[in-house]
Amino acid sequence: MEGHGAQRSSPLARDLTRAFTSYNKHTVLLKKNLKETHAFFREMRQNYSNTCASSTLSSDSSSQETGQFSCISFPSHEEEFLRNTVGAAPYILVLGQDCAARYQLLNCLLGDRLLPLGPEAGQACHGGQGNVCKRRKLCFTHGRQTRLSLALPGQYELVHQLAANCGRWETVPREDLEILDECEDPAHRQAELEITLHHPLLQEAKVMVVPCPSVQPIEEALEDCTRSVIPIILYAVNRDSLSSEQVADLRKVKEILSFPVCYVRLPDASAASAELGQRCEKDKSKLQKQLLSRGLLGSLSGNCSCGAPAQTAAPGAKPQSVVGENFEKLHRILVPFTRQVLQNQQVEAASLLNGLHCRCLDLFINQAFDMQRDLQITPRRLEYTREKEGELFTSLMTIANRKQEEMKDMIVETLGSMKEQLLEDAANLEFTDIIVTTNGDPVTSKEIKSCIQQIQDLIVVRLNQAVANKLISSVDYLRESFVGTLERCLSSLEKSHIESSVHNITSNHLKQLLNAAYHVEVTFHSGSSVTRLFWEQIKQIIHRITFVNPPAITPEWKRKVAQDAIESLSAAKLARSICSQFRTRLYSSHEAFAASLRQLEERHTGRLERTEDLWLRVRKDHAPRLARLSLESRSLRDVVLHGKPKLGRELGRGQYGVVYLCDSWGGHNPCALKSVVPPDDKHWNDLALEFHYTRTLPKHERLVDLHGSVIDHTYAGGSSIAVLLIMERLHRDLYTGLKAGLSLQERLQIALDVVEGIRFLHSQGLLHRDIKLKNVLLDKQNRAKITDLGFCKPEAMMSGSIVGTPIHMAPELFTGKYDNSVDVYAFGILFWYLCAGSVKLPEAFEKCSSKDQLWNNVRKGARPERLPCFDEECWQLMEACWNGDPSQRPLLGIVEPSLESITVRMCNCGSEQKSSSLEDSC
């Protein structure tokens, strides 16, 4: 064979080459996406680990951030699968019943008689004992020159004189294929024959022909194909059935490589090919029945004469083993089988990668919502806590200042009602730890003091309990109206700022201050401030009672001691003392609370600054970058699965892309294709986020379905990259529909459809921001669907950019601070067109000569005029929707039933007179 020049290529080889070329091209993109994903995750981990290391004063903030983004990584099993799959080299593995079958199939693949067949092949593999075939493994690779060499697998080339190198050859010499019996060199016996050819198929994939079983067991021969290889396993069959040894080998292949097998039935030299074809068409061959019975072939609903499945497998379906019964039609089964195996691996890898992108992107978006809420709610909570504490302090001080006289009267009343009972209880008091004689003989001075102390304690306990119960009722209402709310708000602030043990002590101290100063639990058991002050004051007064001579301990004496103690109490002084000390402690607690709250606020301020910085990074960098990776992985999956869509005629042009007709793609027919060429990274990021928001939305009948996306790297001759968004094709847009004419009932139904679609978007946390006539599409029944979610974003991901169509833009859009009420405003303008029944601009907008003038007029309050044909209720609804104050615009949950009632009133039977003005005049 000539050492230079490309090999001839058969139609089978050309189609296989195209399949492998497509696989390798997509593999490059998949590897790039995986590499960038790894780099992104690595950068995220480094950034947040550095943030944690530097945030020594705010371990809570750092732990919050790391907790939020700890799942920004590959699960171990997914990482292992991607490592083994992405970038795996395609290999055609040629197995067979014997060497003759394998060689015949290899020659068919390459379209040339490279390996010897027939008599020149020599001894068959199933020769008699003593004549066992010993042909080595063959590896076909690509090279500019044709050459043969012996090499140890994965190691080095052996210096050995091959017969092929001694002269010209067309077929590989038989002696180079075999291991001679006299060869005793173990390296030479283990070596494989590497055949380098300048063949298009070998440029895209390597080919390996397994050796004879006597040379190397099948499990050892396939050992190198278990890692980073995608094998296309072909099994050549040249007899009607398989031997038990061959079935066992196939089971081993199935265990080693979890890939399907294509069984190729080779023509039998002893039977005419026409006769063989007729036999295949009549019934399943003996081979196919054997493979089915041994579990080596999946059950098939029906095959054509070539052995290929009668029905094409669904896109993305797991490939199954197949049998090619007709060698003349091998092309019809082998090429689809190869494509399906290659496609399945790439689709699975791209889907797994895209699933990871979407999970992490959803995490970023959810965290953006949480951070935005934290930034909004924490300052309000702090202000609310300060305000409510001030109200509580003022209320308690009012009680201390104004309730003194009430306390005095309450104490006098309590003493008066309890006096006789107290005296009786004191007279009957049994002293503890003191022995008193029955005749009341005098005792020592020390025992007298103990008796007096016990009588005092009795009076103090009874009075304290009675007065405390009445004090509680005077301030008890504060507990629920102030303290309960304060505690809940404070608890939420503390939970969002648990930083360290030191800061826990501060938070606990703040709680203790509230419990001690403001709960006003003046029961005896709690030992609260007011009760304790009252008790101490009583003790001080009673202790001033003196006794000169030790008296006899009699009931009369006990009664006298109790009487003197009660009469010594001054209700006025006691009330004044209680209120004075209560005020002092209130003020002290108020100051301590305020200081602690300021300290907590300072810490929250630092945390919120870090949160806002992180929120900006998520919105501006992290989420857009990840969205772009997600768009690329999803588009790669779609193009592998469904191919590149074919562009039809142009349907329309917009600010950011061109819309084409697409007859069929991915099982959808017909489709619309939006071609977008992002000019810079910002537009790329916006488009990627749009695609993510749209694709992750559940299907809804009022939204246009997005079927998929494909990134066209060959756009404009490869100078630009275009993103092709394939979506549902509808009949026309609302602008065209209004120009053609729509009935009143159709227009009101369209209004209801649009409101339903916007409500669904809002329920998913999204704003459309560009509701207008061109973005509402109509089907053949004139039912509406919202399209073009190019400006659609969650509130938490909005950066305040000014987007939309000027006529439909709410005034607050120009300030950059807005919410989902901008869609209500835009609907109000859209509803004006629907009620007008035409596309003529309102007078207020028609006279504007430029976009800037139009914006200025909208900001100044310019709105569409009322047309004579407008129904009063419709006009009121429009005005409410485009109200300049966003808070005054109605919720869509109110707009929808209003529209329904308008529709029922104006379109039902008997309402022709009411609706005739709208129907006829506009």
Swiss-Prot record:
Q: Where does ATP bind?
A: L651, G652, R653, G654, Q655, Y656, G657, V658, V659, K674
Record domain Protein kinase: where:
645-899
Compartment(s) of residence: Cytoplasm; Cell membrane; Apical cell membrane; Basolateral cell membrane
Q: Which SUPFAM superfamilies match?
A: Protein kinase-like (PK-like) (SSF56112)
Family annotation (InterPro entries)? Dual_SerThr-Tyr_Kinase, Kinase-like_dom_sf, Prot_kinase_dom, Protein_kinase_ATP_BS, Ser/Thr_kinase_AS
Q: What is its EC number?
A: 2.7.12.1
A Gene Ontology BP annotation from the UniProt entry: positive regulation of ERK1 and ERK2 cascade
TM segment ranges: none
> Is ATP-binding given among the entry's keywords?
yes
Give any GO molecular function from the UniProt entry.
protein serine kinase activity
Alphabetically ordered keywords of this record: ATP-binding, Cell junction, Cell membrane, Cytoplasm, Developmental protein, Kinase, Membrane, Nucleotide-binding, Serine/threonine-protein kinase, Transferase, Tyrosine-protein kinase
Q: Transmembrane: present as a keyword of the record?
A: no
Entry annotation: catalytic residues: D770 (proton acceptor)
Gene Ontology annotations for the cellular component aspect, listed alphabetically: anchoring junction; apical plasma membrane; basolateral plasma membrane; cytoplasm
Catalysed reaction equations from the record: L-seryl-[protein] + ATP = O-phospho-L-seryl-[protein] + ADP + H(+); L-threonyl-[protein] + ATP = O-phospho-L-threonyl-[protein] + ADP + H(+); L-tyrosyl-[protein] + ATP = O-phospho-L-tyrosyl-[protein] + ADP + H(+)
Please report which protein family the annotation says this sequence is part of.
Answer: Belongs to the protein kinase superfamily. Ser/Thr protein kinase family.
Q: What does this protein do?
A: May act as a positive regulator of ERK phosphorylation downstream of fibroblast growth factor-receptor activation. May induce both caspase-dependent apoptosis and caspase-independent cell death. May play a role in the embryonic development.
What name does this protein carry?
Dual serine/threonine and tyrosine protein kinase
Q: Which organism is it from?
A: Tetraodon nigroviridis (Spotted green pufferfish)
Q: What is the lineage of its organism?
A: Eukaryota, Metazoa, Chordata, Craniata, Vertebrata
Q: Which gene encodes it?
A: dstyk
